[in-house]
Amino acid sequence: MIYPQISAIQFDLNVICNSYCPGCHRYTIVDDEMYLNPFLPFNTSVSLDIVERVMENQRLVDAVAIDMIGLVGEPIAHQEFLDIVDIIYKHKPNACIHIHTNGGLRSTEFFQKLAHKLNENSWISFSVDGLEDTNNRYRIGVNWNKIVENTKAFCDAGGNAIWRTIIFPWNKHQLKSIEQLAKSFGVKKFKTEKNRDENTLWMDKWVKAAENFHTKTIAPIGHNNAMQSTQFNHIKNRCFDDEAIYVNYEGKVLPCCMFNGSLTDTAYKDEMIPYINETNENWNSLEHNTLENVMNNWWWHKLYGHLDTTPCTVCIHACDTVK
């Protein structure tokens, strides 16, 4: 059995967001202008039934780590977010929930309620990439006053908060001030993250394209810039070592968010869609199967067996140990 137990779950709850971060997978660049990704099912949200199907599975460890990420959406934009938290704790009271948010949605009352629901091992990570004058350079459209109000409300109600800041050229001189501001609100941890696109042509490209942002327009579907790769050192099989799975906004189970991103990325999708789906596109769908049936599928053995010999391009780009 490849997964005798499940220790960590990433939930991508929706394809809904209040922000227009130019480096996000929600968007794509065409002729130096930014558009909506034409392959994403915008405004989709995972159902409560899917969350139940995941949490009731007996493979989950007692203190399972639940990571509510935002590959293509803002987790708290899910209309039934607090109900999702209740479902998690109903099945696993000791679950460690980690919520990612830009902090610019909902009300202070919502964050107070959330603080009271979360146990002592659970956290919210506020993604704040600057001060009032610089946060909007990347977190385009996020209301600064909302971030401040919601952070204060959550911390004042006893919640555990982290502020995470991606280091950009326009905010690197502010890091100490950002940390001091966060701590003044009651934030317990401040973390910086290296910008993975720093000093790359890709960053130059999206910085320029963000000046011509078509926030409501779907991009035309163009040619495929395939990124297939065969050169690799050794693949670190993170999903198996960490006993982790990923559940997307349509209720499909995958090894990680990188696999999900590949399905709607022109650089990978022509390779990855047949690699994942093969002859049955619903084998990993929780709309059609229990989580137990999904985890017993032979596909996981195929993936594991390929890591040392013929890994897919996503595994090479994300988990090659030489990187």
Question: Could you say what each language-model-derived stretch is?
Answer:
Residues 80-81, 110:
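Acidic donor-diphosphate engagement hotspot in glycosyltransferases and nucleotidyltransferases
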Residues 1-6, 19:
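Recognition helices and adjacent regulatory flanks at domain boundaries
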Residues 106-113:
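Alpha-helical scaffolding within the catalytic cores
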Residues 22, 75-76:
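A short, conserved beta-strand element in the Rossmann-like catalytic core
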